Amino acid sequence: MRTAALSLALAALCLPLAAAEGGKPGPFTHVLKAGEIAEDCVTLKSGQSREYAWTADTSVKFNLHWHEGETVHYPVRLDGQWKGRGRFTADRDQSYCWMWSAPKAMGATVTGTFKPIESP
């Protein structure tokens, strides 16, 4: 019984991570309510690259980040952006997240695309 309860608790902890595993190649749309965030995460190996481009119908906060224990690293961190574009190359095997935050006073719609880049 105790093992079953522990297994259930561990499975519940994994659900938010599974739901956040986006970042698949192709187009995406996030409709955010006021103050909400959207996050697309993908695991990249060292040297793998991904191109991204997005636009929003209002200015949003945008960042690209990864976690190392309790520390969050931000290779890209921008406030008040209506659009963004770039190419990110992983420097380590890691799960990386692209995140958008709507303003607290209003919602936002973010549309864009992800494109994996094949290594030469």
For each predicted feature, which ranges?
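Positively charged n-region of N-terminal signal peptides that target proteins for export
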Residues: M1-A5
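Acidic, Ser/Thr/Pro
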Residues: A20-P120
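Bacterial N-terminal signal peptides
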Residues: S7-P16
